[in-house]
Amino acid sequence: MYATNLLYLLALWNLWLVSGGQQDIPNGNATLPSPQKPQNTIDQIGANQNYWFTYNALRQNETLAIIDAMESGIASSVLAFQAQMEIQLQPLKIIMLHHAGNIKASNNIKMSRFEKVGSRYFHIEKNLTLTWFEAYVTCREMNGHLANIRDEKELDGILALAPNNSYWVDISKLVEYGGTFVSTLTGREPIFVKWKPNQDKKKQHNCVYIYAKEMYYDECFEKKSFVCQANQWA
């Protein structure tokens, strides 16, 4: 009797354990939780693409603006360089004409246009004012040359025959010799100079004139009177 009751209780105990344990086991047909959607959805990708397209377009416009500004600056620099080269080439053209014989020298100098100073003859232009380049050509057309003054005595003799004015002479630094003033006739430094002290030295002051028994430098395109020498050598 007791054995039967004990077996019955054990059976009930096992049945309770089985029924209680199954309550904790999830149903195999239960719905699983939905996975979290990724952040980069199709809409977000499209928005990012639009952002980058806009960014790239702005950067491209900025780059094009920079290129346009650079091209404009380069064009201005080229024009300035061309103008500067034209100025620098003008004296070289004159020298080339001189050496090529386009301005032909002749011994038949019209001496009536020249005055004797010491042992040499000079034409002192008292009325016409020209640039240094024009004065150079005018003296060559007389079959002479812009004056190379040999000494102070010759300088004083020339100015004694001339009104109180400024006169171009053959001293310049148009062709680079280390920034040194030279004669275009000899290609060497002048044998005589008498500079006015404390002159304002400027890069474009490349041509020399005489005034009041002293020598000055000025821009070659300034118009002044000039002195030619009859002989075509130094």
Curated annotation (Swiss-Prot):
| Glycosylated residues in this chain | 29, 61, 127, 164
SUPFAM superfamilies linked to this entry: C-type lectin-like
Q: Where does the UniProt entry say this protein principally localizes?
A: secreted
Q: Its GO biological process terms?
A: sperm storage
Per its UniProt record, what InterPro entries does this chain match?
C-type_lectin-like, C-type_lectin-like/link_sf, CTDL_fold
Q: Where in the cell is it found?
A: Secreted
Could you tell me which residue ranges the C-type lectin domain spans? 137-234
Tell me the GO molecular function terms: carbohydrate binding
> In this record, what's one Pfam family?
Lectin_C
Q: Which GO terms describe its cellular component?
A: extracellular region
Enumerate the CDD domains for this protein.
Answer: CLECT (cd00037)
Q: Which residues form the signal peptide?
A: 1-21
The alphabetized UniProt keywords are:
Behavior, Disulfide bond, Glycoprotein, Lectin, Secreted, Signal
Q: List the disulfide bonds.
A: 139-228, 207-220
| Role of this protein | Responsible for physiological and behavioral changes in mated female flies.
Name-wise, this protein is: Accessory gland protein Acp29AB
- Protein encoded by which gene: Acp29AB
